[in-house]
Amino acid sequence: MIGRERMTVASQRLIAERTYELTLSGRLVQEMRQPGQFVHVKVAASADPLLRRPLSLCHIDHKQGQCTIIYRQEGKGTALLAQKQPGDTVDVLGPLGNGFPLEAAPADSRALLVGGGIGVPPLYELAKQLTKRGVKVVSVLGFQTKAAVFYEEEFAAFGETHVATDDGSHGTAGRVTDVIEARSLEFDVLYACGPKPMLRALAERFPNRPVYLSLEERMGCGVGACFACVCHVPGSETAYKKVCSDGPVFRAGEVVL
């Protein structure tokens, strides 16, 4: 159920270049279940900036009543969010969207998780939940450079993990698709989140496989009312789907990337 709450900042720390890990406490956590969903955060009490920021859920801890989100400081909104200290509160709406289908990976199957940059965070909760279901998880994480790398050890706790950097400063030099090819990584189902070129490359590389992609789009309302995040459906000039409410996770081929 979607709710709204002024959640309390439990902790915040810089974990990579311009990348922050923010942990929030509140009753709204009990509504958070599906990996790949997101929350819409109002970063300031004033009307500037006006729009909420869509931030994916990285970790859900029902026992502690806490959720963790990871974001990159890009503009005024996230700069304000980066200033939040423990004890401060933020206005949170969520959980929103349709996340990754866990049922696509039955017990004893092999799931390949592929993340690019700030698309990595939602895959962490996915890795955790898949592992609990008896799924073998292999992760491939892509970043621009070593300074941008985060959560490598955290993913390694769930299984085989590979890192690629564009400049070769850490892990494999190149892209996530280079790692998949070089390592001949096999899978029964693939889950991915990251920039569109990466998602497009994965969809084209595995056209007849179960591939689920989480799209990153700018959003206005987060609930499907404003039509700011629509994407087209293949074979139609008029049909579309909304990333915020129909997604953000789609099966490859379901929408035009």
UniProtKB/Swiss-Prot annotation:
Record-listed [2Fe-2S] cluster binding positions: 221, 226, 229, 244
GO molecular function, one term: flavin adenine dinucleotide binding
Domain of life per record: Bacteria
Cofactor(s), names only, from the UniProt record: [2Fe-2S] cluster; FAD
Cofactor note text: Binds 1 [2Fe-2S] cluster per subunit. Binds 1 FAD per subunit.
Annotated S-S bridges: none
Domain FAD-binding FR-type: 2-102
Binding site for FAD: 53-56, 70-72, 77-78
Keywords: 2Fe-2S, Electron transport, FAD, Flavoprotein, Iron, Iron-sulfur, Metal-binding, Pyrimidine biosynthesis, Transport
Keyword Thylakoid attributed: no
Gene Ontology biological process terms from the UniProt entry: 'de novo' UMP biosynthetic process
Protein's job: Responsible for channeling the electrons from the oxidation of dihydroorotate from the FMN redox center in the PyrD type B subunit to the ultimate electron acceptor NAD(+).
Family label: Belongs to the PyrK family.
Subunit structure: Heterotetramer of 2 PyrK and 2 PyrD type B subunits.
Name this protein carries in UniProt: Dihydroorotate dehydrogenase B (NAD(+)), electron transfer subunit
The species this protein was found in: Geobacillus kaustophilus (strain HTA426)
